[in-house]
Amino acid sequence: MSAEVYQPEKDTPAENLTYVSELTDGRNLYQISITLLDSNGHRSYQASSMLQVQVVGGRLLGLENGDLADVTEYTANYRRAYHGELIAYVQADSDIPAVVTISGEMLKTLAVTVPANN
């Protein structure tokens, strides 16, 4: 399993920045792209493992997998990967970095750090 952290505000067109800021109360919003990998380190398109996401020092806003048939509540802290991917939206709400832990059955637990809200 791998994860990359993105900050949508840095790639958002200027006309949309106010909207993003209103949604997040001016706090930083991060998108974490989670990819399930095979034993060779390649994305496993067949993987649909149930993943759980825990956040310490921040807030999980939602999980998205791109599967239109998945009716899991958006704000739940669990969701199945779809075609080997899952996206977590996290908000830092303190002056310390948030730690995001991703786990799943028969998968190594992965922890990523999200920068503090400055």
Q: Residue ranges of each PLM-predicted region?
A:
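Beta-strand-rich structural segments
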Residues: 27-44, 51, 100-102
